[in-house]
């Protein structure tokens, strides 16, 4: 196992990395050198063969031009002269009919005047272009690499034959192998020297690191007296010097570590809430950003001050009571912002029982309290809205039971009031059910792409025909605007807004409709303005709250439930839109609705 540990040491790893870098470098150089050398040698070989073939081509062309009757004999003599090169195995002249007219190889003389079926020869004759390829052939001494070259011979524009040359390229590769062997031997010698040098070089790096490792082991045992030997002024020497300084400082700081560790652990545990940490006297020493935000104070106003005074608890609790009482309680810690927090206190105690500080954890429950308050208000509003018509109905029914039904004048009036109150309760219950579905996201929204101009004009026309005493003014763009909405749900929204506009208008009633499109953001804004009594500026933002009425008596008299605009807001937001209001008291109210939209040309809208 000792050799395995030595193999895993930094010293060995540095040597291995050093050797691997050398090997990789030599491999890259060798690969490039071998490929370049092979390419150069083969190109030179082929260039020489092509030069011989070109000389043959010129001579054969001259023979066929000067003495065609005696051409075969003269070509044979010519090939015999060119066949004395060592690398050339065979030279043939093949006429345009693929008949062997002459050959330089004696063993192939029996093939003269015979037709040869060779694809490369046929290709050279048919295309009139030279070609070449490599093959392996056995000439009796084993398989050898042969380079075959075909060069067409032309007399003017007519191809009269083809020169076929087989050349032995094996010598080129033998020469290349010899060079590679020399390169490999040189690489091996270099690696041997590199390994030896690598061990000595790596030792100069690992020796100080080994010393620091040994010192670290001693420090883990609590021994801070030893120092690391500094071997030089390089980076490792500076590291050794810094390590010695660190050892000294750790020794000095060890006494304070336990107390700080416990305090920081407590702070980290509760970082999602507001954290206030103090010393043993209750003076604030650490406070996080959340606590600063919740208290609405700066860090300078908190650090060093008494924690109970900061939380306005100085008259109610003492540090001893906090230490004994672990109960949490609600505290209004920021009256300006209306922030309510649940406060938990904990005490930091050492193992000896000595108290070193206190921790206050502030958990923001403002939203929870708001939800609970809204729930109570909602229940109270529903109870009130149901109790009023029920009380009225009960009174009329009691009167009818006592004999009013016999009165032909009063009975119909009492029954009419009872029916109206019943219908109002039905509307209220239906609105509550719709809001409940929207809160639970179970309300079905069935969107479809509609022509908004046609959609809004249809709604306005319906109200215009029903309300003869109201003037409707339209400013709607002429270009077609398409939007994806649920027509029924959005009709409910516009009916709600238009009905309110007509209901609260006065004098010469006037309702204006403005539609403006922002093509850059694919949004459109619909503005519906009345000339009614308006809404006080401090109540404008509340009109979309459930059961909120600016004038409760007038709204109830007109049959409203106080839920119409709340439902409208939920529907618009379900369409990725927004609804809000602007109003000047005594000058009317404007309701704004924004929705996604597209301006689509007729050609883009045609279905395939």
UniProtKB/Swiss-Prot annotation:
Compartments, record wording: Cell membrane
Major place of residence: membrane
InterPro entries cross-referenced by the UniProt entry: HAMP_dom, HATPase_C_sf, His_kinase_dom, HisK_dim/P_dom, HisK_dim/P_sf, Light-responsive_reg, PAS, PAS-assoc_C
Keywords per UniProt: ATP-binding, Cell membrane, Kinase, Membrane, Nucleotide-binding, Phosphoprotein, Transferase, Transmembrane, Transmembrane helix, Two-component regulatory system
GO molecular function: ATP binding; phosphorelay response regulator activity; phosphorelay sensor kinase activity; protein kinase activator activity
Gene Ontology cellular component annotations, sorted alphabetically: plasma membrane
EC number of the protein: 2.7.13.3
Domain Histidine kinase: residue ranges: 381-599
UniProt entry tagged with the keyword Transferase: yes
Domain of life: Bacteria
Pfam families (alphabetical): Cache_WalK, HAMP, HATPase_c, HisKA, PAS
Catalysed transformations (reactions): ATP + protein L-histidine = ADP + protein N-phospho-L-histidine
Enzyme class: transferase
Domain HAMP: 203-255
Membrane-protein topology: Multi-pass membrane protein
Post-translational modification comment from the UniProt entry: Autophosphorylated.
Membrane spanning stretches: 14-34, 182-202
GO biological process, one term: regulation of DNA-templated transcription
SUPFAM superfamilies linked to this entry: ATPase domain of HSP90 chaperone/DNA topoisomerase II/histidine kinase, HAMP domain-like, Homodimeric domain of signal transducing histidine kinase, PYP-like sensor domain (PAS domain), Sensory domain-like
Known role: Member of the two-component regulatory system WalK/WalR. WalK functions as a sensor protein kinase which is autophosphorylated at a histidine residue and transfers its phosphate group to WalR.
PANTHER family: SENSOR HISTIDINE KINASE GLRK, TWO-COMPONENT HISTIDINE KINASE
Protein name: Sensor protein kinase WalK
Protein species of origin: Staphylococcus haemolyticus (strain JCSC1435)
Lineage: Bacteria, Bacillati, Bacillota, Bacilli, Bacillales
